[in-house]
């Protein structure tokens, strides 16, 4: 079994959101994680809030993501740039992910270019 690291978490996040697999995506987050999405002006808190976010902005818009770049600042953070396409057209997303010691996502700051 391949050891889990932040790169694996990022790749898995892209794959599970592209598959619209909300349960598998939520498994990557700590129970009290937060997504702060500046582009929509809201914070989504905990698994319930993140589930709502995924349903609304990924499932309902048929969003597909492609990783453009990733910088891993240390064991606790990653900055990624993602190409989003879906029913809304096309956008480039900028995400700053923070991880806990168990490699679960605890916070995402999200915005669009």
Give residue ranges: language-model regions:
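Short, low-complexity N-terminal intrinsically disordered segments enriched in polar/charged residues
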Residues: 1-19, 23, 27
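Short charge-dense sequence patches
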Residues: 1-8, 43-48, 103
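Hydrophobic alpha-helical segments typical of transmembrane helices
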Residues: 9, 21, 53-54, 93
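Hydrophobic pocket/interface hotspot
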Residues: 13, 25-26, 33, 46, ...
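Flexible interhelical turns and helix-capping residues at alpha-helix boundaries
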Residues: 18, 33, 86-88
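A solvent-exposed, acidic/Ser-Thr-rich amphipathic alpha-helical stretch
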Residues: 22-23, 31-68
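A beta-strand edge to alpha-helix "cap/lid" segment located at domain peripheries
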Residues: 51, 58-113
């Amino acid at each position: 079994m391949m050891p889990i690291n932040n790169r694996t978490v990022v790749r898995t996040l892209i794959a599970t959101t592209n598959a619209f697999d909300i349960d598998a995506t939520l498994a990557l987050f700590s129970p009290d994680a937060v997504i702060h999405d500046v582009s929509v002006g809201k914070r989504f808190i905990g698994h319930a809030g993140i589930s709502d976010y995924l349903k609304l902005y990924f499932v309902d818009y048929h969003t597909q993501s492609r990783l453009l770049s990733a910088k891993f600042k240390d064991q606790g953070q990653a900055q990624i740039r993602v190409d989003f396409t879906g029913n809304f057209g096309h956008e480039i997303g900028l995400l700053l992910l923070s991880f806990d010691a168990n490699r679960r996502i605890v916070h995402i700051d999200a915005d669009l270019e």
